[in-house]
């Protein structure tokens, strides 16, 4: 059985220009590398069996998703507890905070910018009575979500939910947004746009 027959859903991602072979000339278990092109125009090379059996997708889209996951997770859990969260707001410090929950005076950051900016953020948060939690994205989304729940618990915000289900909802919301960026499903995360940043309720 050829790829075109067994995995016809992947035909739209097969890069017909860069591949010498056609989907009708290879099988889903092949270890040959092929070129793929996602619906967003990203092109990448991957073994056919990685794409079919391991269900790996576009590396660029995956990196984008993982870079946004921490902020999306904070807004998702904030929304579950009826809390407003601001994503990427610079209104407090003059430099953007990745996520900020005003009612709790809580900022959660996953990335690390320039060391001087990080020192300045920590100092300015302390001066304003804002608790700054550094929670780097390590491991899987599930690991991060579990660690985030523990971080919330440390400030007496208790979230009891199925973490695997939470991660799936966050991932699906992200993919919906990628399909229709102009109609980002903000309401799913309890969010709305305000100027250059997003507020989540």
Predicted features by range, described:
Residues 1-81, 90-95, 102-106, 121, ...:
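Functional cation/ligand-contacting sites centered on basic and imidazole/sulfhydryl donors
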Residues 86-88:
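Surface-exposed, proline-enriched loop/turn segments that connect beta strands in immunoglobulin-like
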Residues 94-98, 144-146:
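Short, solvent-exposed polar/charged micro-motifs at secondary-structure junctions
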Residues 103-149:
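Basic, amphipathic alpha-helical patches used to engage nucleic acids or provide basic targeting signals
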Residues 141-159, 163:
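Ampiphathic alpha-helical segments that act as solvent-exposed interaction surfaces
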